[in-house]
């Protein structure tokens, strides 16, 4: 008798995504791997998404629904983590899609190699660009250890630190929870999660389709809430320096790049905005400018650092030119 394949728990936080939710669920139902459960965590939706969750559960017995007051994506993910029954779990956002062979490939490789997690690049798409583009592409499948995986994440070499699309062995994830009430929760938790892994499967092809919305956290301007990323970056650097000290420089480099991006966002609004945050960023860049000359640092980041050390207006102009070139390269 053939041994039953391990159960995969799919966690989907749901909040006011009625137009996209059925497509998301259907991408799970289309999996060639059939031993899964789908946990829809309705986070206090007001657009009918919660009712749609219930309808979908009636249609498919593998779907379980949990309704809760609105507490944010992190809170909803944490509820899902508490309810998982599978050996593995997968994080999927309710407006995104998963490729049909993903679970087959993830389970096969993790079971064969004893890996604790599987990561893939994202394909990012929108209504305006349905063909999308691949974020952090790389060439070949690899089995990496903890340090190699974290290094690739820190340097954005083929994988990032987003939690959407992460496939994880449940017992290895353990008691980790996403921080509730702040932005950039993925940045805050994913390095802690990977630090618990002995081996990680990294796939070259995207198996997660990430939908970009105008006004999303990734694309909207800087507000007071966004400035928490300065603390998150500092906290992650501290954690890595203590846990995997060989990667301290790479962690500081990610913090440097994150701070530069945040400064650009502040200046997009007003050069006089958030003076304390600007001073904090400039101080960090001044103290860590040598990182931009490391062999793994990107030339574009070195130029941003050097121009900022001259003056903010030059930095802003150069950064904006780089964004314009990247945008038009993608569109071509």
Q: Where are these predicted regions, by residue range?
A:
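Cell-envelope/extracellular polymer assembly enzymes that use nucleotide-activated donors
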Residues: 6-9, 37, 188
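Short, well-formed alpha-helical segments that are part of the catalytic scaffolds
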Residues: 16-30
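A conserved acidic beta->alpha catalytic loop
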Residues: 34, 42-52, 69
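Glycine-rich, basic loop-to-helix element that forms the pyrophosphate-binding segment
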Residues: 68-84, 97, 105
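Donor-binding/catalytic cores of nucleotide-activated saccharide
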Residues: 73, 94-200, 215-224
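Short aromatic/hydrophobic "clamp" motif used to bind/position activated sugar donors
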Residues: 89
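Catalytic core of nucleotide-sugar-dependent glycosyltransferases
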Residues: 207-213, 220-247, 261-291
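Membrane-interface aromatic/basic loop that binds lipid-linked glycans or pyrophosphate carriers
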Residues: 271-332
């Amino acid at each position: 008798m053939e041994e039953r394949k391990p159960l995969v728990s799919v966690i989907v936080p749901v909040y006011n995504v009625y137009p996209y939710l059925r497509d998301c669920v259907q991408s799970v139902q289309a999996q060639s791997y059939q031993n899964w459960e789908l946990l829809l965590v309705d986070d206090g939706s007001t657009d009918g998404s919660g009712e749609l969750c219930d309808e979908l559960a009636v249609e498919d017995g593998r779907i379980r629904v949990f309704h809760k007051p609105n507490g944010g994506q992190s809170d909803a993910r944490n509820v899902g983590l508490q309810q998982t029954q599978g050996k593995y779990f997968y994080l999927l956002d309710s407006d995104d899609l998963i490729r049909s062979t993903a679970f087959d490939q993830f389970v096969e490789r993790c079971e064969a190699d004893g890996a604790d997690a599987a990561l893939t690049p994202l394909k990012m798409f929108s209504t305006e660009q349905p063909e999308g583009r691949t974020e952090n592409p790389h060439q070949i499948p690899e089995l990496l250890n903890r340090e190699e995986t974290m290094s690739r994440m820190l340097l954005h070499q083929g994988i990032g630190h987003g939690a959407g699309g992460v496939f994880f062995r449940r017992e290895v994830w353990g008691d980790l929870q996403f921080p509730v009430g702040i932005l950039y929760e993925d940045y805050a938790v994913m390095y802690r999660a990977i630090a618990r892994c002995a081996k990680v499967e990294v796939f070259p092809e995207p198996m997660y389709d990430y939908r970009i919305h105008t006004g999303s956290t990734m694309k909207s301007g800087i507000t007071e809430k966004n400035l928490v990323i300065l603390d998150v970056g500092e906290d992650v650097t501290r954690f890595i320096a203590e846990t995997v000290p060989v990667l301290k420089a790479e962690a500081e480099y990610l913090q440097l790049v994150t701070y530069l991006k945040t400064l650009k966002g502040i200046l997009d609004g007003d050069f006089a905005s958030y003076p304390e945050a600007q001073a904090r960023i400039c101080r960090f860049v001044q103290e860590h400018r040598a990182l931009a000359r490391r062999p793994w640092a990107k030339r574009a980041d070195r130029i941003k650092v050097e121009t900022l050390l001259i003056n903010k207006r030059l930095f802003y102009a150069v950064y904006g030119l780089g964004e314009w070139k990247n945008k038009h390269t993608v569109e071509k």
